[in-house]
A protein has these predicted regions:
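Class I S-adenosyl-L-methionine
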Residues: 2-39, 181, 187-410
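Conserved SAM-binding strand-loop segment of SAM-dependent methyltransferases
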Residues: 170-180
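Conserved SAM-binding loop
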Residues: 162-163
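Conserved SAM-binding loop of SAM-dependent methyltransferases across substrates and taxa
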Residues: 135-146
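Conserved SAM-binding motif I beta-strand of class I
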Residues: 148-153
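Conserved Class I S-adenosyl-L-methionine-dependent methyltransferase catalytic core
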Residues: 38-120
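Conserved class I S-adenosyl-L-methionine
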Residues: 125-134
Length: 410
């Protein structure tokens, strides 16, 4: 493996790219009927708007491969270069007893095994701490060779279910009901623990990093998820380096890395598309009803709403938002307009898609730099293919070594 750039150099390159081009990735096509950058790149905008919904879906997960007008190819090449990161080395997958996989969905089981295979530390962990553990599936997998295990979870039903599973499987585990954001959460963490978090959201994994540093945990492993699940409207950088950046991120901005979807089934995709097309059709209607050409946020709606006809959907949503009642509308035309806008939105979002991974790496490096500033040696890389989960980045940290490494292809 060739020597990799330092964490700082990687962060600075990503920061320059994201800052310079933020006018391309910050505006959201779903909210804005026209995007500011369309005036600068009319050929690209017209080309994208003329494409079908199926075209957009085909390019969604690999937007960089799209042969689009300038400046798309140049941006795609830079984004691809900045996003290069290799998988972390894996140990031979252990033979996992069928009983150990009790109650674990297949995809989650594979994620757990891939995550566990990458946890190489100088010191053999003696006590695993499964953060936001759910039923403790990850912790039990890691502690199968006899290490101690503590599982922290706020949902009492999951705590009880996990405790029963551990007892049934003969795993010596302590399952505790704990709100990890509460002021007493630090009492559960000790320097001898090896904390692990597989897809802990936003504030939850940030809290773990902060407490692990405060408690001087010797080593830890975190695969972040849902960076936008934070309390504050504005993102508060964790490291001194990110704090000095001119890039000021909102909670909405943090949702960009999560827009990649590879695990949804056909039915889920159909429902998602219908929901978005109907919302966009309603958006056209509400602008007319309010006589204001601006987006109106609407709440998440139960799936039963999609079983209404479109006219009833719009009437009921207008009532919910306390808007004037719709009059005589051409409902089929309005619904068609919603589907047409969805095709345009999805294709315009391909520009934002070029910045998904760079922004995710910027956020991951902010976390890594925080740990490096506190004396940790940090390794970053993927732990599984993106087809298994798009959130496949893993941060490994060990206290007391000056070296750092971002795993990149040779």
């Amino acid at each position: 493996m060739t020597a990799s750039p330092s964490l700082l150099e990687r962060f600075q390159a990503l920061d320059r790219f994201l800052s310079e081009h933020q006018a391309l990735w910050r505006p959201r096509p779903f909210v804005c009927r026209s995007l500011p950058w369309e005036n600068d790149y009319p050929e690209l905008a017209a080309w994208l708007r003329a494409r079908s919904l199926a075209n957009a879906e085909a390019a969604h997960n690999q937007p960089g491969e799209l042969a689009a007008p300038a400046p798309f190819p140049e941006l795609a090449a830079i984004a691809c270069e900045l996003s290069q990161i290799d998988e972390l080395p894996a140990s031979e997958p252990p033979a996992v007893a069928h009983r150990q996989n009790l109650d674990i969905p297949g995809r989650k089981s594979l994620q757990i095994q891939a995550f566990g295979a990458r946890l190489h530390f100088r010191e053999t962990p003696r006590h695993w701490l499964d953060w936001c553990s759910g039923k403790g599936h990850l912790g039990r997998h890691l502690a199968r060779n006899g290490a101690a295990l503590t599982c922290l979870e706020w949902d009492e039903a999951l705590v009880n279910a996990g405790d029963q599973l551990s007892e049934r499987l003969g795993v010596d585990a302590t399952h505790r009901c704990q709100d990890v954001l509460a002021s007493d959460a630090g009492d559960q963490l000790h320097a001898t623990h090896t904390p692990v978090a597989l897809h802990a959201c936003g504030d939850l994994h940030v809290r773990l990093l902060q407490l692990a540093v405060a408690k001087q945990c010797r080593q830890l492993a975190v695969a972040p998820c849902c960076y936008n699940r934070i309390t504050d409207e504005q993102y508060v950088p964790l490291s001194q380096t990110a704090g000095a950046s001119s890039l000021q991120l909102t909670r909405d901005d943090l949702g960009l890395p999560l827009s990649e979807t590879v695990t949804a089934g056909a039915r889920e995709r159909r429902n998602r598309d219908q929901s978005m097309a109907w919302r966009l059709g309603f958006d056209t209607l509400q602008r007319r009803l309010r006589q204001q050409d601006e987006y109106l946020p609407t709440p998440s709606l139960p799936g039963a709403w999609l079983k209404k006809d479109f006219a009833d959907y719009c009437h009921d949503l207008a009532t919910l938002k306390q808007l004037p009642a719709p009059g005589d509308e051409d409902w089929p035309a309005l619904e068609r307009a919603g589907w047409q806008r969805l095709a345009e939105v999805r294709n315009l979002e391909l520009v934002r898609g070029l910045f998904r991974r760079p922004l995710e790496l910027w956020l991951l490096l902010d976390r890594a730099l925080l740990l490096e500033e506190q004396g940790y040696r940090v390794r970053l890389g993927t732990f599984c293919p993106s087809q298994l989960t798009p959130r496949n980045l893993l941060l490994l940290a060990e206290l007391g070594s000056p070296a750092q490494n971002v795993t990149r292809p040779e």
